[in-house]
């Protein structure tokens, strides 16, 4: 088992005006999220979110972080969200085991001492996408089946953005310290997500793109200020960090899905500032 946690530092809008393609990818793109038998995480200084992939195969896996966070155990001062995008598996949370099929989610509150991830079949392993944010209070652990996610249809075929937003961890459904997490699926024939674009100065956000309709599908993710945009080309199962001051949207060569996760000082989902289309550059 390999464990690796990369670090991404925070940048101002002025910084990325001077980034070339290589530098932009180094600072905002996570190219490898899932690797069989491994835990691959990224710590971003944007609101101190930790995110990444856990892929257990023959053996179960546990995230063990202490000195790196200045604590005795990983979730001593953090909460955790999980969504499985792979084969069937399970999570054991302080001794309580829950089955996790594809698209199932789980919220795990501050103070939980042990979270163990396992796959039912090593040949078809679970792929647990995990997101952790700082916490100040303990909220109950809760399994979040896909069937119970709050579905919100958005967009239309004319604008190539027909999609469904599935809210797993959302202030309208459950209490958390600051974590919000969900899953957006674009319909065949649609390619744009989050367009028209917006920003939310009180929350940062990560996007993890996956379930590409074709092997050669690519997504061009847009970030930066609305008048100074940049793009990053993403492959399947890659993630990008979006600072709170940045737009965050993308267009694919075919349809796809992505997991979004947010944290910051405001949990109101609709607390955002729309960007007029004529402002984009």
Swiss-Prot record:
According to UniProt, the reaction catalysed is: 5-dehydro-4-deoxy-D-glucuronate = 3-deoxy-D-glycero-2,5-hexodiulosonate
Name the coenzymes or cofactors required. Zn(2+)
Question: Biological process GO annotation list?
Answer: D-galacturonate catabolic process; D-glucuronate catabolic process; pectin catabolic process
Q: Which SUPFAM superfamilies match?
A: RmlC-like cupins
What GO molecular function terms would the record report?
4-deoxy-L-threo-5-hexosulose-uronate ketol-isomerase activity; zinc ion binding
Could you tell me the keywords of this UniProt record?
Answer: Isomerase, Metal-binding, Zinc
According to the UniProt entry, what is the EC number of this protein? 5.3.1.17
Q: What class of enzyme is it?
A: isomerase
Pathway, per record:
Glycan metabolism; pectin degradation; 2-dehydro-3-deoxy-D-gluconate from pectin: step 4/5
Residue positions binding Zn(2+): 198, 200, 205, 248
Q: How is the cofactor bound?
A: Binds 1 zinc ion per subunit.
Q: Which InterPro entries match?
A: KduI, KduI/IolB_isomerase, KduI_N, RmlC-like_jellyroll, RmlC_Cupin_sf
| Protein family (similarity comment) | Belongs to the KduI family.
Which HAMAP family does the protein's record reference?
Answer: KduI
User: So what does this one do?
Assistant: Catalyzes the isomerization of 5-dehydro-4-deoxy-D-glucuronate to 3-deoxy-D-glycero-2,5-hexodiulosonate.
Protein's recorded name:
4-deoxy-L-threo-5-hexosulose-uronate ketol-isomerase
- Gene that specifies this protein: kduI
